[in-house]
Regions:
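Amphipathic alpha-helical and helix-coil boundary elements used as assembly
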Residues: 1-216
């Protein structure tokens, strides 16, 4: 919408490729992207892929594989599941501050955004000591509301990096930009720090697949 993404007065592309230029603009406004494989129209049709831009993952479909279960892969199972589960936590700042001079309104713009991520007792204490602060170029944002939205987008980027999971699965129909529920860990180690206390325990949560690679 025009309120969420105001029209840019000027865009400068310098010493960067077209994809790098577009990704820089998307990243600034909190727009994520991914590539989705489309169903083949016929067995002889060439593969088709769609570039997907999004600012919310709430509308993505469920994964074709359905609910997944973790196990060690040491025994024969009746279905394809997750055999490797590796949660990754990253310490991120507790506050983002952005300021800029708005020459159109002849006033300074300033906004801050605190984190909603929970990184454990020690992690939260360290996070409160970390600040992502920057003075942006003049007229960085279209308005005060846009300035706050851009600041919030930067904090949401940090929150996304707080917790992720790398893994392996024997399921052959996992698809990027879909989500699935993870049922049991069945002895697999790993607790996932994340946004809100509900993600402290890995079991029974929904996860979005952002990257899928195939081997073999």
């Amino acid at each position: 919408s025009p309120d969420r993404y105001p029209q840019r007065e000027m865009s400068i592309q310098w010493n960067e490729s077209d994809p790098a230029f577009l990704m820089r603009l998307w990243r600034k406004h909190g727009i994520a992207w991914g590539v989705r494989a489309e169903a083949d129209a016929s067995p002889t049709a060439p593969p088709r892929h769609t570039l997907v831009l999004f600012d919310s993952a709430s509308q993505f479909p469920a994964n074709p594989a359905g609910r997944l279960r973790c196990h060690t892969g040491t025994s024969v199972q009746g279905r394809d599941d997750i055999t490797l589960w590796s949660p990754v936590g990253q310490l991120t700042p507790g506050l983002v501050e952005r300021s800029a001079w708005d020459y159109k309104r002849q006033q300074a713009q300033w906004a801050d955004a605190p984190t909603a991520a929970r990184q454990g007792d020690e992690g939260d204490a360290l996070s409160r000591a970390l600040l992502d602060a920057r003075i942006e170029p003049p007229h960085w944002a279209d308005s005060g509301a846009d300035h706050h939205q851009l600041t919030l987008a930067r904090m949401q980027h940090h929150e996304m990096n707080t917790a992720s999971v790398a893994g392996a699965s024997s399921a052959r129909d996992l698809a990027c930009l879909t989500w699935a529920s993870i049922d049991e860990r069945a002895g697999l180690p790993g607790r996932l720090p994340g946004v809100g206390s509900g993600l402290a325990d890995v079991a029974g949560n929904d996860f979005l697949f952002t990257q899928v690679s195939h081997w073999g």
